[in-house]
């Protein structure tokens, strides 16, 4: 595989990840969001090079998370230009996490080839998501692949059984099987057919369960939740003369929310 092909797959992985999440609404991307990573891992398995696996994984995480988290700089730049440094540190760390995942998955394929990638990848990548969600001040617990399917409510209803992590494992499993089906369609039609059928069957089952839940689940009002956002400027927050005005504004808005309930 040439460097250009690796760069293309890394870039494609970043684009798929970006468009899989809101505000974009392309649910089908959630099922192939890790396809570029799967293609890279298949190549790494054939090479048996764990050092190269970490390198490719680092670039994959660095670029993809750099694209997805672009808003960090946009949102925080007016507070301090140091937000650019924080953004860089964050995506470098994400690259290290992803590099570790590529290294481990390649190592597992080398030492335990009888365990298929559609088993190891969902488990290891979900561990990565858990680590990213518990990374201190730069934690992103909402960045799981399962959260990308929220634009297809009928397909995520079974999260009441497996949670967002369960949805994520399913989507990762689909990515692996779809890539393997595409690779085996020439010469191994039966193998490709059962992989494609397995994905379609799980989507159909998810749809059926979701449709049932959405039509039979009884809803009742439990209360009113109000969000108060006074839009106080960054520099105003540190001005002692503005303290009382800010408190009065918060109290006024809170009373308005309470009156609405």
Residue ranges of model-derived segments:
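Membrane-embedded alpha-helical bundles of multi-pass enzymes
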Residues: 1-216, 247-251, 255
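Soluble catalytic regions of membrane-associated enzymes that act on cell-envelope
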Residues: 210-261
């Amino acid at each position: 595989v040439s460097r250009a092909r690796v760069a293309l797959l890394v870039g494609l992985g970043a684009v798929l990840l970006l468009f899989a999440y809101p505000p974009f609404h392309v649910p089908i991307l959630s099922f192939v969001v890790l396809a570029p990573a799967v293609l890279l891992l298949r190549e790494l398995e054939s090479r048996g090079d764990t050092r190269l696996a970490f390198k490719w994984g680092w670039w994959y995480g660095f670029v993809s998370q750099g694209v997805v988290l672009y808003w960090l700089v946009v949102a925080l730049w007016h507070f301090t230009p140091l937000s650019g440094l924080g953004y860089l540190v964050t995506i470098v760390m994400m690259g290290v996490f992803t590099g570790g995942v590529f290294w481990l998955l390649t190592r597992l394929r080398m030492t335990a080839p009888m365990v298929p990638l559609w088993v190891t990848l969902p488990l290891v990548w979900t561990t990565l998501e858990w680590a990213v969600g518990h990374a201190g001040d730069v934690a992103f617990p909402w960045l799981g692949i399962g959260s990308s399917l929220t634009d297809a409510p009928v397909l995520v209803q079974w999260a009441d059984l497996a949670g967002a992590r369960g949805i994520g494992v399913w989507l990762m499993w689909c990515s692996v099987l779809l890539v393997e089906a595409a690779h085996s369609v020439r010469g191994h039609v039966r193998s490709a057919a059962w992989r494609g059928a397995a994905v379609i069957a799980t989507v159909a089952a998810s749809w059926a369960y979701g449709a049932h839940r959405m039509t039979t689940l009884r809803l009742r009002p439990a209360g009113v939740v109000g969000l108060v956002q006074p839009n106080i400027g960054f520099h105003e927050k540190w001005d002692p003369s503005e303290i009382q005005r800010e408190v009065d504004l918060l109290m006024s808005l809170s009373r308005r929310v309470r009156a609405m309930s």
